[in-house]
Amino acid sequence: SGTSASADDIASLVTTVGTAYSSLTDKIDASGISTFTGTASNVLTTLTSATVDEAANPNVTLSDSTVDAATLILVRAETSATVDVSTATTVSGEASDVNTVLAVGYVTGLGTEAVTLTDTGAVAATTLSSIASRTTGTINASSVATVEGTADAVNTAYGIARISGLGNEAVTLSDTTLDASKLATTDGYTDGVVNVDAATTLEGSASAVAAAFDANDANRVSGLGATGVDTVNVTGTTAAAADLINIENSVTDGVTDVEATSLTNLTGSTEDAITILSDTDFEDLGDEAVEISDTTLGAARLNVLDSKTDGAVSATSVTTLTGDVSD
């Protein structure tokens, strides 16, 4: 009797009695109890047992120091009254369940506890960030095998210092238009493979795009190979000719469009500049200014370069010019 009762004791009684009550009309009378206390599992047993007659929507005060999120969700489903979890210092469970129980107003007493995730598959990066926003405690994600989401979402989650245990899992990016510099950031966060199969367009500076293809060649990134992106868009106003050559050598027959419309300046050796300005895949090139890096240069090759662009050619690095007087 009374307004509060131990669910631990009631659950123990239920277990002791076993199936005996299945043939009896009498039940354990807990109808006068307004608050049940005990572990989450024992409270759940009390609230769901057919042998216990309890009042509708009792209050619950849990005693767990580590509470299982999935069990807490089941307890919450049995009562609309207060569920107090103030004693818990750790919440464990799958990320989606943990995120649910940490939501403001779902239960009381949470918000500063540590979190231990038990997922062994993929977890959405947005869920990791959401969990971090709902507790000030540390979040152990060492069991997670894959982090998935947009590059922005993934990089945000990796950047949260309170999330530990990440660094060797796979990543699956969902961007259809993928920023190469953001891909580089993701690649730097994990030793696992970053899958970009969803991407149809890769864009960024020439150096960032070239680095993305290098990462693919090194098997740190997957999805930029034979069945990779359809379009490569080189952004920015200045590019090293060597990076553009790297991109040209990396794109496959499946890439239907290589764009560099924003480029106004090329840098690099004369031979690299001639090579890329002669490349038909870069249809937007031909009017850029070129700053060559050679110190020794044949005049004939300089003339060839000059014929490849309508822009000015700067040869201030050249200290020795060779060739015929006519050149």
State where each predicted segment sits.
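General marker for long, soluble alpha-helical cores
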Residues: 1-327
